[in-house]
Structure formats: C-alpha cells, structure tokens
C-alpha cells in the first residue's frame, strides 16, 4: 500500500506532468516571470469557468481578503461580521485593517455562518459580511444576500475552500460560490482543490469600477506605471504559478468528482456508526470536499488523532481554537463571547485524508482504523 497522505500533490502532478512541465518551460523561455501574458490568460480562463466578469490574481488568499476590504474602502471601526469557526486568515485581515470583527455562530450541520446569527449581529456600524464556504460547501447565500440588501451591506465571500462549488438558488438558478456577493476571494495554496505549487490567490467580481480598483491595489495602487493613485500593496501571482494553475483548472471538475467519490466511500464505511456524524450536504450546495470533516460523539477526539498517527493515518483538526478565543483578538474581549455551537464543534471535529489520489486499499485501511478506535 502506498503511504497515506493528508494531501497527495505529487501523485496528482505525475498524472499531468507533461502538460505542467511544458507550461513551466514556456514561462522560463519567455523570461516573463512577473505579469507575463499567462497571468492574464489564466485570469480570463478562471473568469470564464466561474462565469464571473473579472478575476484579479494576487499573491495569496489572505492578500485577496485584505485587498477586497481595501477596495470597498472600509474604515477603522467599521464592523465586519464573520464566523469564528474558520481559518485565521478570514478574521486576521479585519484586525489588520483596524476594522472590528464581529464573531458569530455557524450552522452546526454545514459548519458555515448562520444567517440568523448574522441578522442578530447587525448594528449601525456594520459594513460587511464575510461568509466562509467551509470545507467545500457553500454558506446559505440566498439568505445572506437578502440580509445584505436589507441593511445595505457588502458581502465578501471567502471561497478559499470551495472553488468549483455551485450554489443553487430557490428558483433553480446555479452560481459558482464566490460570484454571488460583492467580491469573492480564493487561495491557491498547494493543498487547495485548485492548488498551485507555491502561493497564489485571486479576487472575483462583476463590478466594473471595483475590478479596476482591486487591480490597482494589488499592484501598488498603480493606474499606470509609476503613477500611484491609491494606497496599495505588492500582491502579484507570478507567471509560473499562473501557468500551473491554468493547466490544473482544466481538471478542476474532475478533481471535485474524485473527492466526492472518496467522501461517498467514507460515508458508506461509517454509515452504521452512531458515534461518527458524516458531513451533511445542504440541498442548496454542491459539496466539493476540500476536507472530509466528521463530528465525533462519545469519542475522545484527541486520542483518536493520536491513535491514527500511530497507525500511519494522518488526520487534522480544523480548527482546535476558534478565532474569538485567539490571543490576537484580546483587544475586542471576544473570548467572553458565548458561542456554544462553535465551542462544541472545536472539541469534536476531525478531518480525514481527502484528495484526488486516494485508492480503495488506502480508504479501506483508513476507515478500518477509525472504526477500530471508535468501536473499542
């Protein structure tokens, strides 16, 4: 049996090695390592895939969130509603820009931000909502957009974990996550469903003027070379990463299907185990399974994590400490917040290996070891 990995980028690379190597060679031969034509080509291809009007590539997913908030001209003291149960980058940029994070609960089934909690958190200072499409499943965007329209709020979708996911509106219309709100952001970190071989990120929007502003901010605020109209940053997707992503984009839907097959295998393996709650699929979302995250009941999660490691089965805890309890947010007194759903989840979730290259032998071994511990 091949070594089991949480993410197997090497085996995936071997399947498309010829195309990837040629794409990288073309960039090297051109010497256009920064802002080469392949960057714009990738942006156009991604926009077409997403059915978004504009895609603005940048250096990483965290920068994408920061550039989005800068582009919307959010001011110090403005409140931004965000889940606490998320990767820290979502919330970190809010504090970095001296905005005020307002942490709210998630839906215990979908792990995504709870629309009822959003509505209850809106104040006169609220300017934006940041829904996170966590683990590969969409947040309840129709309800979120209704709230945003009612209170005239921006919506910045953190789509780092759900690129390729479809949201299905109540009228049957489908839209890709990240294209529904004011701005969508994503990360091309290597472990992502569409991952580079280094860092990378992007923003997407359908707003003409906003797209111009986002492009400027990502490149030192330049309107043209050496003319800087806005305060910006140095956040560019390099040409080699763009070339890699441009090739991998062709396989994104295929990768999502492979992930769904893995998820289906796990579902069947754990179907008769009451102590393992497998991922819920919302009727309004296609799940692209960036992670396969289960909730444990009556099981010592940390001991399972340790046992699996001893059995050469990697697993991860996403996330052991929610944002509102992190020291970096002490100035907001957020640790005092009563967030029972978030606290409950952080004690019980565990993520199993999830990627496109898992085979049946590996999956049988993983699931058998999980059940061996759980059924003790």
Q: What spans do the regions from the language model cover?
A:
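N-terminal "arm"/small-domain region of PLP-dependent enzymes with the aminotransferase-like
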Residues: 1-32, 37
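PLP-dependent aminotransferase class I/II
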Residues: 10, 22, 39-45, 49-55, ...
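Phosphate-binding glycine-rich loop
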Residues: 31-79, 93-97, 103-105, 170
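Structural detector of well-ordered beta-strand residues that form the stable sheet scaffold
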Residues: 56, 81, 102, 155-156, ...
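PLP-dependent aminotransferase-like
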Residues: 70-166
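Hydrophobic/aromatic ligand-binding patch that stacks against planar heteroaromatic rings
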Residues: 93-94, 147, 176, 193, ...
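A short alpha/beta connector and helix-capping loop motif
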Residues: 112-119, 170-183, 363-365, 370-374
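Conserved active-site segment immediately N-terminal to the catalytic lysine
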Residues: 157-195, 225-229
């Amino acid at each position: 049996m091949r070594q089991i990995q949480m993410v197997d980028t090497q085996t995936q690379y071997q399947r498309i090695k010829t195309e990837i190597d040629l794409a990288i060679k073309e960039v090297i031969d051109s010497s256009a390592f920064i802002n080469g034509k392949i960057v714009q080509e990738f942006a156009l291809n991604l926009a077409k895939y997403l059915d978004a009007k504009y895609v603005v590539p940048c250096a990483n997913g965290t920068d994408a969130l920061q550039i989005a908030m800068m582009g919307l001209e959010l001011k110090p003291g403005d409140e931004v509603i965000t889940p606490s149960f998320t990767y820290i980058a979502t919330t970190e940029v809010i504090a970095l820009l001296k905005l005020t994070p307002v942490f709210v609960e998630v839906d215990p089934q979908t792990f995504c931000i709870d629309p009822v909690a959003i509505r209850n958190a809106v104040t006169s200072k609220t300017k934006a909502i940041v829904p996170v499409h966590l683990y590969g499943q969409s947040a309840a965007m129709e309800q979120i957009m209704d709230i945003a329209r009612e209170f005239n709020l921006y919506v910045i979708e953190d789509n780092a974990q759900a690129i390729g996911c479809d949201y299905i509106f109540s009228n049957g219309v489908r839209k890709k996550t990240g294209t529904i709100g004011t701005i969508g952001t994503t990360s091309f970190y290597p472990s992502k469903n569409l991952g580079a071989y280094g860092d990378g990120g992007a923003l997407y929007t359908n707003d003409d003027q906003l797209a111009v502003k986002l492009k400027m901010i990502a490149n030192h605020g330049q309107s043209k070379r050496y003319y800087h109209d806005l305060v910006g940053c140095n956040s560019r997707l390099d040409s080699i990463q763009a070339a890699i992503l441009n090739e991998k984009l062709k396989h994104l839907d295929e990768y999502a299907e492979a992930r769904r097959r893995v998820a289906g295998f796990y579902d069947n393996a754990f179907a008769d185990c009451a102590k393992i709650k497998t991922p819920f699929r919302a009727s309004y979302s296609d799940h692209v399974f960036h992670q396969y995250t289960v909730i444990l009941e009556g099981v010592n999660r940390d001991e399972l994590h340790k046992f699996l490691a001893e059995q050469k089965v990697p697993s991860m805890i996403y996330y052991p400490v929610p944002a509102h309890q992190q020291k970096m947010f002490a100035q907001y007194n957020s640790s005092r917040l009563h967030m029972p759903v978030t606290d409950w989840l952080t004690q019980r979730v565990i993520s199993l290996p999830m990627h496109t290259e898992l085979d049946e032998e590996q999956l049988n071994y993983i699931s058998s070891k999980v059940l061996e511990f759980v059924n003790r």
